[in-house]
């Protein structure tokens, strides 16, 4: 049994479910907060509900819940952990357990933790001793999506085990509707979680200052409650009221991306933006 661990079930449903489908000689268990139980059941042999608040950047009560799950897991089990945030919680949960796991961490982007935000810089300094003490004991492998993240995190954490570069999580191309022709009135879109380090403010300024009549700007995505870089509800309401920009909420990019002509990606500290790969294909 291979255990996939993430702090959000959508992480294990989107691209990772395709990997599970391809590796049909193995059984997979999802360990995450279960929101979309029906989707998880399509792909995973078993799903364990790891309760964690997404409204907190670090939900330390979730450490005890994950620790309980790890205690009930067989010695020598295989774990694949997704995102740096989940990796940190896994390290703490695994501390002093009388078990040895085969664990791999996928860093899909360094995100808020490596941003220029003052609070993030303080967090980074305070948590470094924990990474220095535990990262090599916990993870046999770390997978990165770009060399910049690989160099930065390995230097920060002094990670000495196996470091791998896999550029992008990939997409399943038959799932996407392809674009036949461009619109007469050009549609520009930025799609992703509504985080400040996704370049939302710059995109909004661009839409306000752009004066061509045949261009329309769209923004798609949800708030990421609990992420310190997330827009607030008040900021989102201001965007909704903005005449230069059309807010769409969450959309299914596999079915909807072909309706747009140009995609912007303005992210900082992104591993390899999945939406860029989707746009290049569509």
Task: Outline where the language-model segments fall.
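A conserved mid-protein helix/loop that constitutes part of the nucleotide-sugar donor-binding site
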Residues: 11-18, 186, 190, 195-209, ...
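Membrane-proximal helix-turn-helix segments that form the acceptor-binding/catalytic region
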Residues: 19, 67, 122-142
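Glycosyltransferase donor-sugar binding loop
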Residues: 32-37, 171, 191, 216-233
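Donor nucleotide-sugar binding/catalytic pocket of nucleotide-sugar-dependent glycosyltransferases
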Residues: 49, 132-177
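Acidic anion/phosphate-binding donor-loop and adjacent secondary structure
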Residues: 57-58, 154, 164-186, 196, ...
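Short His-centered aromatic/hydrophobic patch
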Residues: 81-89, 107-108
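Nucleotide-activated donor-binding/catalytic signature segment of Leloir-type glycosyltransferases, i.e.
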Residues: 230-251
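Aromatic "clamp/platform" in nucleotide-sugar-dependent glycosyltransferases that forms part
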Residues: 268
């Amino acid at each position: 049994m291979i255990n996939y661990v993430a702090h959000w079930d959508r992480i294990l449903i989107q691209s990772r479910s395709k990997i599970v489908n391809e590796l049909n000689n193995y059984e997979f268990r999802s360990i995450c907060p279960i929101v979309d139980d029906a989707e998880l059941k399509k792909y995973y042999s078993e799903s364990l509900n790891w309760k964690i608040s997404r409204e907190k950047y670090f939900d330390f009560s979730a450490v005890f819940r994950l620790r309980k799950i790890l205690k009930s897991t067989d010695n020598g089990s295989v774990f694949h952990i997704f995102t740096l945030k989940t990796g940190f919680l896994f390290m703490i949960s695994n501390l002093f357990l009388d078990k040895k796991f085969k664990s791999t961490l996928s860093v899909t982007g360094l995100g808020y933790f490596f941003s220029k935000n003052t609070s993030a810089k303080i967090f980074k300094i305070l948590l470094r001793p924990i990474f220095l003490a535990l990262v090599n004991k916990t993870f046999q492998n770390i997978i990165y999506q770009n060399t910049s993240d690989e160099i930065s995190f390995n230097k920060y954490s002094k990670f000495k085990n196996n470091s791998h570069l896999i550029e992008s999580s990939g997409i399943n191309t038959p799932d996407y509707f392809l674009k036949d022709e461009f619109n007469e009135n050009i549609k520009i879109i930025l799609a992703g979680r509504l985080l400040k380090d996704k370049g939302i403010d710059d995109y909004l300024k661009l839409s306000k200052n752009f004066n061509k009549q045949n261009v329309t700007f769209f923004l798609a995505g949800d708030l990421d409650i609990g992420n310190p870089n997330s827009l607030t509800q008040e900021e989102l309401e201001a965007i909704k009221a903005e005449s230069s920009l059309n807010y769409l909420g969450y959309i299914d990019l596999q079915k909807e991306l072909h309706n747009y002509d140009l995609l912007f990606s303005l992210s900082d500290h992104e591993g390899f933006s999945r939406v860029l790969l989707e746009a290049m294909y569509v």
